[in-house]
Amino acid sequence: MGRSMLPEQQEDVSRKSKKEKKSKKDKKRKLEAEAEVVVVEAAAATSTDEATKSSKKKRAKGDLGQGEEAENGGGKVVAVTGKGSADAKYAPLSSFAATALPPQVLDCCKGFERPSPIQAYAWPYLLDGRDFIGIAATGSGKTIAFGVPALMHVRRKMGEKSAKKGVPRVLVLSPTRELAQQIADVLCEAGAPCGISSVCLYGGTSKGPQISALKSGVDIVIGTPGRMKDLIEMGICRLNDVSFVVLDEADRMLDMGFEPEVRAILSQTASVRQTVMFSATWPPAVHQLAQEFMDPNPIKVVIGSEDLAANHDVMQIVEVLDDRSRDSRLVALLDKYHKAQRNRVLVFVLYKREATRVETMLQRRGWSAVSVHGDKAQHDRTKALSLFKEGSCPLMIATDVASRGLDIPDVEVVINYSYPLTTEDYVHRIGRTGRAGKKGVAHTFFTQENKGLAGELVNVLREAGQVVPPALTKFGTHVKKKESQIYGSHFKEIKADAPKSTKITFGDSDED
């Protein structure tokens, strides 16, 4: 659905007769419930005025159809689906000025030359009140993509004659404390010039200050599912006036077993609302949630691909080694990548105890390091992240709690000391570097214990044009994968009567 064709396929299609094209289009419309499909190049958002006018004309005439691509500077292909998606009024933005939004709302965009692809495509739909699904890699500017429309939504509601004061209008749900705090930091800063207030609700810390903030009145609530549900049940957090809902990292929330909490929270919001969902992948569980809680014809924008793929700005180096040699190799790599101890290096491990052990080992060998994992108190985690972000301690050891969504600027190197449990987590880990168009390096240790994931890793490396070490292919390259026209090749077959994910915490788990 909305998947783009290769240039070779486009050439073949162009040779077919008009009659064949019409027949295929009719069948497609029937299968897609008359959804209009537009596939365009992300770089179109930054093209010249002439190209933008041409794009608008094509949209108005319906000339842009499924499978059409425009290659320009190696940009990513953007696929847009949904009823009315081809309307000229939804043409992607070429500049911030093209939005005609109030200066105070756009204040948060100062310093950026132009909207990122996800912002350029999302804003026209979101500002028009459409339900929206965004599939894009981390580091693509998603927070501002939904943040600016959220601010405009609050401004409109505050301007209504019957508007209540001090009640939440916008809800943003996030899977982890750190990501929730990061979103809150952005929205607090962005909302200040507009007089719009936000509060962040997350576990691992006292409820007192959060309750006080809610009682004093806020416009935007950002939170994790667990703490949100607790405060709702206490009668402290009332969401009945929330008419703009964002589910950020939706796939991660469901992976963590938060589906019951998400459903319970959504049921507390206004029945008439705008629902926005951002996700790095599009698995069946997320699709099902969208079907239940969104408009029957939401807009869906896919930046790049729905399939599992790594950031092409990251050079991936995979080293197959014995488990016992990881400590010495880590030290050797730090001598190579972090000798001056000034550039930011992020080392990922799998378990909380492992994070503490590696941190201690490196400190004993003279390295200044901090760590972030679930056993640390929230204020210690926040302090460690701050030291790393500001560069006071540019070497951090972290569990996967830091692999999703966190925007840590200028991370030059990611080292996977322990390979993650899934290839998806691998992609998100290495996505901490190579952000915002910069280049990065990801060096990964792969051991005999990880051999079951070798085939998937080989596919990720090949898709990104990276070197595949012969030692990795010896583990096998076969991947059992079921194709689906709806979900693509990254599709997991789930039986209809299969039990839903539940949140299970192990002794050394790092889920919050």
Swiss-Prot record:
Residues 123-300 form the Helicase ATP-binding domain. One of its GO terms (biological process) is rRNA processing. It comes from the Eukaryota. Residues 333-476 form the Helicase C-terminal domain. ATP binds at A136, A137, T138, G139, S140, G141, K142, T143. Signal peptide: none annotated. Residues 1-33, 45-76 are annotated as: Disordered. Its main location: nucleus. The keyword Phosphoprotein does not apply. The keyword Hydrolase applies. A motif (Q motif) lies at residues 94-120. It is found in: Nucleus, Nucleolus. It is an enzyme of class 3 (hydrolase). Its EC number is 3.6.4.13. Residues 16-30 have a biased composition (Basic residues). Keywords: ATP-binding, Coiled coil, Helicase, Hydrolase, Nucleotide-binding, Nucleus, Ribosome biogenesis, RNA-binding, rRNA processing. A motif (DEAD box) lies at residues 248-251. Residues 14-45 form a coiled coil. It catalyses: ATP + H2O = ADP + phosphate + H(+). GO terms for molecular function: ATP binding; ATP hydrolysis activity; mRNA binding; RNA helicase activity. GO terms for cellular component: nucleolus. ATP-dependent RNA helicase required for 60S ribosomal subunit synthesis. Involved in efficient pre-rRNA processing, predominantly at site A3, which is necessary for the normal formation of 25S and 5.8S rRNAs. Belongs to the DEAD box helicase family. DDX5/DBP2 subfamily. The Q motif is unique to and characteristic of the DEAD box family of RNA helicases and controls ATP binding and hydrolysis. This is DEAD-box ATP-dependent RNA helicase 5.
